[in-house]
Amino acid sequence: MRYASKVNFKPELPYINRAKVVLGEHAKSSVDADAVLIRYYIPEKQQDMIKTALPKTLQDTTIFICRTTIDLGNFENDLKPHVHTNEQCVLNYYLTTNGEETSFFEGAVEPDPNIATDNGNLYYMVNTEKLQKVETFQSNTGESWLLSTRQPHQVFCKTEQHKVRDMVQIYFMDLSFDEVRKHFEVAQ
């Protein structure tokens, strides 16, 4: 795959359920709707434990770590195609999954003015008319996937059940998707 890679990353998370302080909420279908995506603060000691599970060559890079929940039942079963404008890639360690598929697109990247944008969270939805789906993967609980967040991508839940997807996310600000992937390949 060009825009996603399954990697060997399994952090110890004995206290992850304590991550309850909300850092940000976004991806609402309307102004008064519940947020689809909520990011939670992870205490520093827990973040340090997560960092030690990374390849040693990545432990001192500029990263942001949080716990994220996505409730696709609030948003027509999908998180529309979007790109991130701050970090270059993200490592998702999936705590709970429900048959969601992540798809990547190629084509002209234009903001979609009809969908709420980032609320300061540094991402925006993109117009799908000029995009073509090029690859898709399904993540499972306990897996870790590295994603190229500058490439348009979408999360779609295939099941009728609207369970919350729960994950730990590690955002890499200064390294590209390909650079981070190489660090994981060398570490194996």
Where do the language-model regions lie?
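Non-heme Fe(II)/2-oxoglutarate
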Residues: 1-78
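Extracellular structured ligand-interaction cores
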Residues: 2, 78, 88-92, 99, ...
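Solvent-exposed residues in well-ordered beta-strands and their adjoining turns
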Residues: 10, 96, 171-173
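A general structural signal for short secondary-structure junctions and capping/turn motifs
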Residues: 53-57, 81-85, 135-138, 157-161
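Secondary-structure boundary elements
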Residues: 55-61, 96-101, 175-178
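Short His-Asn-centered micro-motif
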Residues: 67-68, 82-84, 93, 147-150, ...
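Catalytic core of non-heme Fe(II) oxygenases with the double-stranded beta-helix
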Residues: 72-144
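Catalytic core of Fe(II)/2-oxoglutarate
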Residues: 118-188
